[in-house]
């Protein structure tokens, strides 16, 4: 199994370590590779789009010619996990808590609506306990950093975890989106669930 991690910015190292832990837990002989240009997408079984600044990630991906290819592969069934800014990249509808609708480059493959900077500047980062029983796990303490919120889901998109009634983890077929940072959490539950998607 070969997992690619988009490596322009964001927590590449942290995702790498969580994936390694999940591989070890499941006794999977897996390979993890950084993805920056289209040829890096060749032969991968799944891809992670980490946090960072979603507009920057989109613009760099577009400039390096990977955005369209990524969209095509995800639409064709490549398992993907987008965390925080990565979730924004996957959404079909994006607006900003302050400025409203945005026109940033997106993959736009998931039937969700996301509001960027949902929790406002006062809560730039915080931790919260969420219930992961819908993915067969218990409660987990997770980290939110300038987090967005999934405010609407339609089609086959479904909510897997909420915080105060707002979706923070969603899935649609081969796509997993989190508004928190699972790579900064004590648990490998989210990465394990992603590997379960990859294994099919």
Swiss-Prot record:
<keyword id="KW-0315">Glutamine amidotransferase</keyword>
<comment type="pathway">
    <text>Cofactor biosynthesis; pyridoxal 5'-phosphate biosynthesis.</text>
</comment>
<dbReference type="GO" id="GO:0006543">
    <property type="term" value="P:glutamine catabolic process"/>
</dbReference>
<feature type="binding site">
    <location>
        <position position="116"/>
    </location>
    <ligand>
        <name>L-glutamine</name>
    </ligand>
</feature>
<dbReference type="GO" id="GO:0042823">
    <property type="term" value="P:pyridoxal phosphate biosynthetic process"/>
</dbReference>
<feature type="active site" description="Charge relay system">
    <location>
        <position position="181"/>
    </location>
</feature>
<comment type="subunit">
    <text>In the presence of PdxS, forms a dodecamer of heterodimers. Only shows activity in the heterodimer.</text>
</comment>
<dbReference type="GO" id="GO:0036381">
    <property type="term" value="F:pyridoxal 5'-phosphate synthase (glutamine hydrolysing) activity"/>
</dbReference>
<feature type="binding site">
    <location>
        <begin position="145"/>
        <end position="146"/>
    </location>
    <ligand>
        <name>L-glutamine</name>
    </ligand>
</feature>
<dbReference type="GO" id="GO:0005829">
    <property type="term" value="C:cytosol"/>
</dbReference>
<keyword id="KW-0378">Hydrolase</keyword>
<dbReference type="Pfam" id="PF01174">
    <property type="entry name" value="SNO"/>
</dbReference>
<feature type="binding site">
    <location>
        <begin position="52"/>
        <end position="54"/>
    </location>
    <ligand>
        <name>L-glutamine</name>
    </ligand>
</feature>
<dbReference type="GO" id="GO:0008614">
    <property type="term" value="P:pyridoxine metabolic process"/>
</dbReference>
<keyword id="KW-0663">Pyridoxal phosphate</keyword>
<feature type="active site" description="Nucleophile">
    <location>
        <position position="84"/>
    </location>
</feature>
<feature type="active site" description="Charge relay system">
    <location>
        <position position="183"/>
    </location>
</feature>
<dbReference type="InterPro" id="IPR021196">
    <property type="entry name" value="PdxT/SNO_CS"/>
</dbReference>
<dbReference type="InterPro" id="IPR002161">
    <property type="entry name" value="PdxT/SNO"/>
</dbReference>
<protein>
    <recommendedName>
        <fullName>Pyridoxal 5'-phosphate synthase subunit PdxT</fullName>
        <ecNumber>4.3.3.6</ecNumber>
        <ecNumber>3.5.1.2</ecNumber>
    </recommendedName>
</protein>
<keyword id="KW-0456">Lyase</keyword>
<dbReference type="GO" id="GO:0004359">
    <property type="term" value="F:glutaminase activity"/>
</dbReference>
<comment type="similarity">
    <text>Belongs to the glutaminase PdxT/SNO family.</text>
</comment>
<comment type="function">
    <text>Catalyzes the hydrolysis of glutamine to glutamate and ammonia as part of the biosynthesis of pyridoxal 5'-phosphate. The resulting ammonia molecule is channeled to the active site of PdxS.</text>
</comment>
<dbReference type="GO" id="GO:1903600">
    <property type="term" value="C:glutaminase complex"/>
</dbReference>
<dbReference type="InterPro" id="IPR029062">
    <property type="entry name" value="Class_I_gatase-like"/>
</dbReference>
